[in-house]
Swiss-Prot record:
HAMAP family found in the cross-reference section: RNApol_bact_RpoC
UniProt record similarity statement: Belongs to the RNA polymerase beta' chain family.
Assigned GO CC terms: DNA-directed RNA polymerase complex
GO biological process: DNA-templated transcription
Ligand binding (Mg(2+)): 607, 609, 611
Name this protein carries in UniProt: DNA-directed RNA polymerase subunit beta'
Domain of life: Bacteria
One Gene Ontology term of the molecular function aspect: magnesium ion binding
Amino acid sequence: MAKNEVLSLPVDSLKLSQTALDRLKLSGISRLEDFNTFNLKELQMLLSDSFNEVLPTLIYYKLPRDVRDLSLSDEVVSVLETAGIKDLEALTKYDKSTLYHVFKDDEFLLKEINDLFELYHEEKLSTLNVATEVFEEVALPQEVSVEDRVNKIIQPIRKTYGSKAFTHFKVRLASPDEIRNWSYGEVINHETINYRTSKPEPGGLFDERIFGPTRDYQCACGKKQTVNKGQICPKCGIEITESKVRRERMGHINLEAPVVHTWYLKNSPSRLAILLGIKAKQLEEVVYHASYIVTDPGQNTPLAKKQILSEQDYSLLVEEYGSRFTALTGAEAVKKLLQDLDLDKEVKNLRKRLKTSSKQKRDRIIKRLDVVEAFNQSDNKPEWMVMDVIPVIPPDLRPMVPLDGGRFATTDLNDLYRRILNRNNRLKKQKEQMAPRLITKNEKRMLQEAVDALFDNAKRGKKAAVERNRHLKSLSDLLRGKQGRFRQNLLGKRVDYSGRSVIIVGPDLEMYQCGIPREMAITLFKPFILRELQLTHGAEKKNANAKYERRDDDTWRALEKVVREHPVLLNRAPTLHRLGIQAFEVKLIDGKAIRLHPLVTPAFNADFDGDQMAVHLPLSPEAQAEARLLMLASNNILNPRDGKPVVTPSQDMVLGNYYLTIEESKDRNFGDDLERTKKHQEKHRHEGKFFSSIDEVKIAYENKDISLHTRIIIKPESVKDTFTVEQKNMYLVTTLGKIIFNEILPETFPYVNEPTMSNLSEKTPDIYFIKKGVNPKDALKHIPTPEPFKKRFLSMVIAQVFKLFHISETSRMLDKLKDLGFKYSTVAGITISYADINVYSKKKEMVEATEEEINEIEEWFEDGLLTDSERRKLVIDKWTNVKNEIQSGIMKEFDKDNNIFMMSDSGARGNVSNFTQLVGMRGLMSNPKGETIEVPVQSSFREGLTVSEFFISTHGARKGSTDTALKTAESGYLTRRLVDVSQDVIIVEDDCGSSHGVYVEAIKDESGKEIVPLYDRIYGRFAAHDIISPKTGEVFVKRNELITEEIGLAIVKSGMQKVEIRSIMTCTSSHGICAKDYGINLATNQFVEVGEAIGVVAAQSIGEPGTQLTMRTFHTGGVAAGADITQGLPRIQELFEARNPKGKATISEVEGKVKDISRRGGSISITITDTQGTEYKYTLDPNIEALVKKGQDVVAGQKLSSGSINPKELLRVTDVKTASNYILEEVQKVYRAQGVEISDKHVEVIIRQMLRRIMVIIEGDTNILPGTEVSIDEFKRENKEVLKNRGRLAVGRPILLGITRASLRSDSFLSAASFQETTRILTDAAIRSKKDELHGLKENVIIGGLIPAGTGILQEKFFHYDQPEDKKPIYDDFE
């Protein structure tokens, strides 16, 4: 077999152990040629102990081929390439003496080559007991297609070292020499493109000699010269190479006068001003040539170093002292001062002053010390903040595009560079012509402004503009904001292989399918179709293309084949949570709309009124495997937010199942309507009839002997086998509808006869059974007719099936439930018409009675017995009461056979409020200010509104639309901040070993009503200690064991009020959280796996229901009239941003007793005595209510007045647990008030991120400065180092940061810069030479690496992944 043929064969053919083969496949090496995609070091690291086993293969086939992949130094590679040795095969042909000559006897370089020869020694082929022919001589069977071979080795878990080429990302200041090294030449004039020839001007901003040719391998002289690749044309001086180098080659501009980098001067706080110890305003005056600064005060002068002189003072001093002193202006002065700085001396001096200074001076010294230390500890020099040379970015990143009519459209950067070049060249001329100092000074100022505009044109001061109102986009503007490089191009990219169309319902689809239009699929799957045509029809590339374009039968057949087993991703914007993108298998359909399974719509929040969805195609086998295993719609049944099913039937499906499970009694009373009674009795004439099998019942139904709702009696075992022994000896009373409903449930599921939880979880209630020998007619009178199955109950059924039978069975059941719903809503023939709506009979008299009462109230007001506000309140109360009375009356009057009532009662559509407005009265309306209008809308929609009623109704409609729009934007921004703060929280280990936990109890509101029950807070969490029953002493669950549903219910039943559970707040894992502290993964109901990105899930779970929250700030009546209580979205923002709340409550700072409560001038004064007898006084506002009484015991952090507590204050007077618990409870109260359930763990993740930093109070012997904020990890690290050396430890206190501030204080500068305040963060990172360790998700997305979550976490250095010898590899079982 020829070697080039062998290289395309799979590694399965190698004589290797199973472990070695598994390692190769996990690394992405499926064929021999794949070795060439790795370098030698990577292979050694990937294969670890299996490397020696694979080595003979590498030696025999000379792999990896390229000398660059042999892990040799750049110097060795360049010598080899110069000698024409470009691959391993060529290298091994040389003997050592020749190589000694090539390397000119350089010992160091020869040692590297010698080591390589030692490794690739031919003798190893025999010593390692491997046949010289490494492959077994087995040709692969011809019929096995490439696709089958690829599918066989799909790796669901893969260690892809190749995609993450670096371990960290560092940023620092560039020195002038480095800028010149980057450059390929100096730009000397402002010319761009010659308008006549359309070619770049020499020496200009697009010069081909500097930046490379504009056309591949073509210099300015003309012809394409691929032969002379890499050479420089002797005529025009242009290198003959690819044109893409114009995207990477930089130039430079040598400045005639130094300029200060504006980021370090104008960004607040000004780093230059702090470093030099000068006020920022004064420094700016010096830089812009308005003042002078003394750099050398000289002998016998009244001047001091760094003294600022005005132009006038400077002139007078020069006259008096001549050249005895030196004062400079502009960037030269700043550069001189920076060069004169002795950083070590400054640090010692400042540290000495720090110990003796007052509080105010200390703050200033710490600020300065921080900047000085940053420079001292990094490899930056302060004078590099002043630039003598500026880089010119590659021309293809600032293109000029020709327009019609000979004009050019250009990027703003070119204008900014041109300004600099113009001013620089003008200054050069002025210097040559010895121009007066005033003129050159002005030119230098203008040059400084031009460079400022290039680096950051959005800062204060003069902005360089094209027209009057549009300022030019500078380099900083390219990075910042939504349209900047970070957010537009790095964190979110547009992708190929995608389509979009309108969605329509596909009731015939399976849960895991979606309908894709053929026309769309044939374009999406084009490369796969072409490959299929080439494989099956042996078509050449050209012919396959022609076939594809003709759209002949072979093409359509190929399409049918490639879409099989190839999932696609469907996405609906806005993607508020991870269920907004799901995978489906393709079912090809005609038409142009995408068909969507009706049950998955709630997850996407989609409906079929014109919504559009995008389709994306996963290309690689790994992506397809991931889509199929993790993202398939039939696997995503539970909502990660609360663990409840997200796929609930809606509308028609609910209505159909409701109709199907209605149970009617023959004796139903219709009052005076004899005709209806007669029809009803005829319909159910065979009520109580005995049947021996389901088939018999169905025949009776076909023969119209019974209806779906008629009560029948049947042998239990003929229906299902899940009845108890006693029940099997009796007869079951049920209906055909319920028998049909139960047929879709799993075999071993209880027979559902009534909509109760006990029926689902235990057994069919005994009340529906008749003993043998009892008269059925009599027995039926005592058996109740249960309610039909409503939407809420259907959700309970789904949850119970999921719990008992898991995903596949549940998705099958859901499909059947959908089909049943559609079928029977059709059979039911439920329609609605005008005749179904009858105005409420008692409405007229109720309204008239209310009007009389209101007239009476008006009279009292005119007699002066009431104030206007009291009158208004009474009137509003009267109308509210009458509306409520009408509402309850309507529900009683509605006939349960009424179609509209059935729609509402089943939960399919509509609610009580809609009915009241349809047939009762619309009631009171609000005006645009949000105040209630006294005059109600008395009409209902059935009667029709008057003109004035219609007008006052429009206020609310308009306000509703506006609120929704505002709310959506606010909610989206909240989600973005939450994701940003928590994106790097990942499950990193199974157990951190923490021995601490948190006590949880039911969350109650002020009135004591339970908002979040104890069960919800403990289910799915791990016990921190053994949980023992207080009554019986029975151990419910041991430490570190999971609290399951049964255990949770038993704990609640035992009457325990508090339970200690493992919590995210007490987790000690660094860079993430451990699985034990997190609990179960709510989306799967399984133990959470290492690598799960729980931070993002938490942020989405909190942000997604954000749009359901209200935007209002309620104004409360009564005692606390002055306090606005914020609710809804603003309250959530207030809590997560840790802001001072509106209507803040006063809290006690100490534990003690209330000594006295007194009123003075309207305000209340509370005196508290602590345990030592010290008194503390608190004054409350006049209209705020005191919540404590005289003599009452209080604890630190207890509310003394009504309102919301400031969490920062609470943290100050109590501890982390109390403050975090307060935020958690308050967040839960807001969401639960809107009926949204969110698991505690999601809120805990966010709160943990808000409490990740410590304020250092005493620095001890650490390097941390007092008064600075550091992360807990850094604080521990520093203290650990000090402990080793037996030094004094640092002391700090925890601080609570709002989510925005916490994101900006992230340890990763890439993550923080891509969030907000980009330039400030990059400025700070540069002067500190910050290193980003790339631990979070965002940083890795930005650099284009694998994210450290899911399978990507396997490559992280703190994980070890070994596959046991004896186990079969994962992918062998994979189908």
